[in-house]
């Protein structure tokens, strides 16, 4: 990485206006990141409240750190494909297109021909954006598809954005891989979030001794000395207090809020706040609440629905419309799933959040009074909705709800976004789920996936090693690499991607269907990323039965019939009326 990259970023930062007091705080955060860039290599944390400008601040740290230590590239690992585009675009605008690579995983062809292998993305640019799914699959997934991405991770700076979204079952696998990269691969890492999870050894000091010893033995992050870039506890507390822009109220109702009750509460808030955002846990709740607002005659131009059933290009167009209305002080009501919580720069006067994990509540609060533009503090409401049991279908949300409710009660009347409350939440959360963190293998009595990749003590041949040690023979290697690769899935119900006929997506489908030259095909496929939707197995089967999904020329790439994509909800398992697609 050349000094020219640093100079371009410094010039851009110098141009930023300071319209609100928060802009001065963001500048100080970026300055602290620059100051700490000269530190020794290692694993660092960057704990910054939502809206603190951590994307460019972490880039500033990484560029100068890479230049200081002669590192080759910066790799941004982001939780969702839905926010890669905007983060990459922000960096591309500063450094130039030739320096930035976006590597999505959702449209990689399922069939690995030799042409696919030759033309699939290499991480050969100075700055790479990818997902946590890609990172974990490279290390632990079966086959060779992801293995080519391991060596570029060495001698690099890895920035993990919203690290709290790391799946609980992957905690020990992730920690061991990252420790290896830093200790033996010559890399450095920065874990960015407003809600720092307890991934290091010091984070489990409050656990009972037996559980603390087990968790540490399985592997936790070996952080650098003075690892928090923003300083120690007192400095962090002051930063969060200075950036406090909202007041959070837990409005609990016995038996939970029904759709009609929650909808009526939303519209009551809308009468006094010009803009309202309601974030829910499931797509069904989002659709039902949106339809309630329609029935109550909320003007269609002011009402928005967002979910991952809409492709990225579709959501981007909706965000643009919302921002235009907000800038003009026009009314906005938005019903969204959790996708709006990560990396979306939008600011509402009022936010309502369905009860979820405390980290999710904090992220939702980051969409309220984001720039401190409103007099006084913004209002964030947390409601316990009437939902079916989420324990089996969405266990992370279910566990988060339980522990968040506990902390909300314990810290009643206090700022629950303060680091002390968040730390208490994660202590409860990780203690409750500590047995899951080594990736327990379903329907197996032979330990966890971490066991399979380490000493594998449950292996039937393990007893032979005791005999070999007694006779001073080398032990047999017991690792079950192949079985571990087959069993590993970042997402329990892995999705499959389909290109949808929204906007330019329709023309790209036609081009892909008529293109036989591999390089050109991959070019169109890269453009089609923004027009793809990830589909869960049960919905995929229903679409197949309806003849709504078609494969492109035996390539393992699929597209959707336009009768199954709507302007309001995106991809629909049931057929919708034919529609025209307009550029928004």
Give a label for each model feature:
Residues 195-269:
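Interdomain hinge/linker at the junction between the two RecA-like core domains of SF2 helicases
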Residues 63, 71-94, 107, 198:
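Conserved Walker A/P-loop ATP-binding site and its immediately adjacent core
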Residues 182, 263-273, 279, 284-291, ...:
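C-terminal helicase lobe and adjacent C-terminal extensions/tails of nucleic-acid helicase motors
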Residues 81, 101-113, 280-284, 303-319, ...:
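Conserved helicase motor
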Residues 96-140:
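Inter-Walker segment of RecA-like/P-loop motor cores
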Residues 40-62:
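Walker A/P-loop
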Residues 1-44, 476, 493, 559-584:
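ATP-dependent helicase/translocase motor core
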Residues 62, 173, 179-180, 245-281, ...:
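Conserved interdomain hinge at the start of the Helicase C-terminal
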């Amino acid at each position: 990485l050349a000094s020219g990259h640093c100079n371009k970023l410094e010039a851009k930062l110098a141009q930023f206006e300071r319209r609100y007091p928060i802009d001065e705080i963001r500048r100080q955060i970026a300055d602290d990141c620059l100051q700490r860039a000269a530190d020794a290599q290692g694993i660092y944390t960057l704990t910054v409240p939502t809206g603190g400008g951590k994307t460019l601040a972490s880039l500033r740290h990484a560029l100068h750190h890479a230049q200081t230590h002669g590192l080759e590239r910066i790799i941004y690992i982001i939780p969702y494909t839905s926010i890669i585009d905007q983060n990459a675009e922000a960096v591309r605008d500063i450094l130039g297109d030739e320096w930035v690579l976006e590597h999505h995983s959702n449209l990689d062809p399922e069939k690995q021909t030799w042409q696919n292998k030759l033309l699939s993305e290499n991480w050969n640019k100075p700055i790479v954006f990818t997902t946590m799914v890609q990172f974990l699959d490279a290390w632990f997934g079966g086959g060779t598809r992801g293995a080519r991405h391991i060596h570029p991770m060495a001698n690099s700076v890895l920035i993990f954005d919203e690290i709290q979204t790391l799946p609980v079952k992957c905690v020990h696998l992730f920690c061991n891989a990252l420790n290896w990269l830093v200790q033996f691969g010559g890399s450095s890492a920065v874990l960015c979030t407003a809600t720092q999870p307890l991934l290091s050894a010091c984070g489990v000091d409050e656990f009972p001794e037996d559980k603390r010893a087990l968790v540490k033995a399985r592997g936790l992050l070996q952080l650098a000395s003075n690892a928090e870039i923003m300083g120690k506890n007192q400095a962090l507390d002051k930063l969060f207090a200075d950036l406090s822009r909202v007041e959070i109220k837990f409005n609990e109702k016995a038996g939970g809020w029904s759709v009609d009750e929650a909808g009526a509460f939303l519209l009551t808030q809308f009468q006094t706040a010009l803009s309202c955002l309601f974030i829910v846990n499931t797509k069904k709740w989002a659709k039902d609440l949106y339809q309630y607002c329609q029935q109550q005659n909320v003007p269609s131009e002011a009402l928005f629905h967002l979910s991952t059933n809409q492709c990225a290009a579709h959501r981007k167009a909706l965000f643009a419309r919302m921002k235009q209305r907000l800038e003009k002080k026009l009314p906005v009501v938005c019903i969204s799933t959790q996708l709006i919580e990560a990396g979306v720069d939008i600011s509402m006067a009022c936010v309502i959040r369905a009860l979820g994990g405390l980290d999710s509540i904090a992220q939702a609060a980051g969409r309220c009074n984001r720039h401190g533009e409103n007099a006084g503090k913004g209002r964030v409401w947390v409601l316990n909705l009437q939902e079916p049991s989420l324990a089996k279908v969405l266990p992370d949300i279910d566990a988060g709800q339980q522990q968040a409710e506990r902390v909300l009660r314990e810290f009643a009347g206090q700022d629950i976004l303060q680091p002390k409350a968040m730390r208490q939440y994660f202590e409860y959360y990780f203690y409750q789920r500590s047995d899951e963190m080594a990736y327990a293998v379903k329907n197996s009595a032979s330990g966890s996936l971490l066991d399979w990749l380490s000493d594998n003590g449950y292996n039937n041949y393990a007893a032979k090693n005791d005999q070999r040690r007694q006779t001073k023979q080398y032990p047999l290697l017991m690792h079950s690499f192949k079985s571990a690769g087959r069993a590993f899935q970042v997402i329990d119900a892995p999705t499959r991607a389909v290109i949808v006929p929204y906007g330019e997506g329709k023309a790209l489908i036609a081009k892909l269907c008529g293109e036989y030259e591999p390089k050109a095909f991959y070019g169109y496929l890269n453009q089609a990323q923004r027009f793809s939707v990830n589909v869960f197995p049960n919905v995929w089967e229903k679409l197949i039965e309806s003849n709504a999904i078609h494969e492109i020329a035996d390539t393992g790439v699929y597209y959707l019939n336009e009768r199954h994509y709507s302007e309001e909800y995106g991809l629909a398992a049931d057929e919708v009326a034919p529609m025209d697609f307009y550029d928004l």
